[in-house]
Structure formats: C-alpha cells, structure tokens
Amino acid sequence: MCLVCIGVVMSARMQESKKGILLKPKTCNTNADCAKFCKGPIQNCLYHTCACVPGNPHCC
C-alpha cells in the first residue's frame, strides 16, 4: 500500500472541502427567490437562508 499516494489523495480532498466553505447559502425572501438557486423541495422561504449549496438539494 502506498502511504504517500494516500496522503496526496487526502490532501486533495481537504482542499476541495476548503473550497466548499466559500459556497455560502443564499438568503431568500420568498419561495420564488429560493427557487432561483434551489431545486425542490421549497417550503416556507420567508426571510430564511436557503440551505441550498452544492451537495444539499433542500431549501428551507
């Protein structure tokens, strides 16, 4: 087993997760606002922060 290879893969994945932190959820005032950024299910999006970031399909 190649320990150096494993370290390279793990460091690449850590860099990917750090980039993901920059993708902040969108603040939406209405279901329509949320729908611009999110794909289903969209419910009760009044002055909420959409949980819609890549990898999380749910809105409010």
Curated annotation (Swiss-Prot):
One of its GO terms (biological process) is defense response to fungus. It comes from the Eukaryota. GO terms for cellular component: extracellular region. Its main location: secreted. Belongs to the DEFL family. The keyword Flavoprotein does not apply. Residues 1-14 form the signal peptide. Transmembrane segments: none annotated. Keywords: Antimicrobial, Disulfide bond, Fungicide, Plant defense, Secreted, Signal. It is found in: Secreted. Disulfide bonds join 28-45, 34-50, 38-52. This is Putative defensin-like protein 279.
